[in-house]
UniProtKB/Swiss-Prot annotation:
Modified residue annotations for N-acetylalanine: 2
A Pfam family that the UniProt record links to this protein: DUF842
Gene: FAM136A
Protein name (record): Protein FAM136A
Keywords: Acetylation, Phosphoprotein
UniProt key word Phosphoprotein: yes
Alphabetized InterPro entries for the sequence: DUF842_euk
Coiled coil region boundaries: none
Modified residues (Phosphothreonine): 124, 126
């Protein structure tokens, strides 16, 4: 049961990341490469100046990648805390003498609720990241 829930979240997050990559990150990569190429075309610039120019071109993409990584880590941490709470409740129930089957059902139900709650956060998280990526790209 938990594996099925994990797969649900994984597929939703992968879909979100693909969408961000296709609609936002890819455009930023194109800008970065074109910007870097123009740095190399300046025949009057020193090697150091060209290097600094290229570094400046990479900044927005690096910021975008850091933003996406940070948001995904926060999401993953929240989901992990929720499922850890479910595990703690299950352990407490076993310690209190509850039947194993009953505890397993409670655990599955709790984990499913965690996943459902976090699946609802994905559209808002996606919107927030897209807005942030657009502001980085400006």
């Amino acid at each position: 049961m938990a594996e099925l829930q994990q797969l649900r979240v994984q597929e939703a997050v992968e879909s979100m990341v693909k969408s961000l990559e296709r609609e936002n990150i890819r455009k930023m990569q194109g800008l970065m490469f074109r910007c870097s190429a123009s740095c190399c075309e300046d025949s009057q610039a020193s090697m150091k100046q060209v290097h600094q120019c290229i570094e400046r071109c990479h900044v927005p993409l690096a910021q975008a990648q850091a933003l996406v990584t940070s948001e995904l880590e926060k999401f993953q941490d929240r989901l992990a805390r929720c499922t850890m709470h479910c595990n703690d409740k299950a352990k407490d129930s076993i310690d209190a003498g509850s039947k194993e089957l009953q505890v397993k059902q409670q655990l599955d139900s709790c984990v499913t609720k965690c996943v459902d709650d976090h699946m609802h956060l994905i559209p808002t998280m996606t919107k927030k990241m897209k807005e942030a990526l657009l502001s980085i790209g400006k």
